[in-house]
């Protein structure tokens, strides 16, 4: 009798873990789909072509930005992005980057919700950037 209860408890623990795992996977898929709708991923060449006529925003934290950033970029860290979103112009394209692209895509979703429509994210982020950089 005791062994049957143990199996029953383990079954429900397994079911709960499976549900949590499924929820996490579904959540990531939703974020991926929303981010693809919010921004276009661009490579270095496309980024370089338009960077002089756009707002370039580095969403890394300030210490990373100070260590080096794309020439002409300004820093709005992801942790403070919602607070400073009002300082971004809607009439100009917005080019976002970071180390990779996950946080930049999340910022793109925020911008899209605020009515921005020209949003781009640098493929590979700062790590893959081969253009001009500014080091402090």
Segments the model singles out, each with a brief description of its role:
Residues 63-95:
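Extracytoplasmic/periplasmic/luminal assembly and interaction segments
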Residues 82, 88-130:
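Catalytic cysteine-centered active loop of the rhodanese-like fold, especially the PTP/DSP P-loop
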Residues 1-67:
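Flexible, polar/low-complexity N-terminal or interdomain linker segments that lie immediately upstream
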Residues 133-136:
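Active-site neighborhoods of enzymes that stabilize oxyanions during catalysis
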Residues 43, 77-78, 123:
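Short loop/edge segments at beta-strand edges and connector loops
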Residues 56, 73-75, 119-121:
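Conserved beta-strand scaffold positions in the cores of enzyme catalytic domains, especially
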Residues 51-55, 71, 90-92, 116:
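Short glycine/proline-enriched coil/turn segments at helix->beta-strand junctions
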């Amino acid at each position: 009798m005791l062994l049957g209860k143990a199996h029953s408890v383990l079954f429900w623990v397994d079911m709960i873990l499976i549900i949590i795992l499924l929820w996490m996977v579904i959540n990531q898929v939703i974020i991926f789909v929303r981010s693809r709708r919010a921004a276009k991923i661009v490579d270095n060449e496309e980024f370089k072509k338009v960077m002089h006529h756009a707002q370039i925003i580095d969403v890394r934290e300030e210490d990373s930005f100070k260590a080096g950033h794309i020439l002409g970029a300004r820093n709005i860290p992801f942790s403070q992005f919602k607070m400073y979103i009002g300082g971004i112009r809607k009439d100009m394209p917005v080019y976002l980057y970071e180390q990779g692209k996950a946080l930049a895509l999340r910022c793109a979703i925020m911008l899209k919700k605020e009515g921005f429509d020209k949003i781009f994210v640098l493929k590979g982020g700062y790590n893959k950037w081969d253009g001009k950089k500014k080091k402090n």
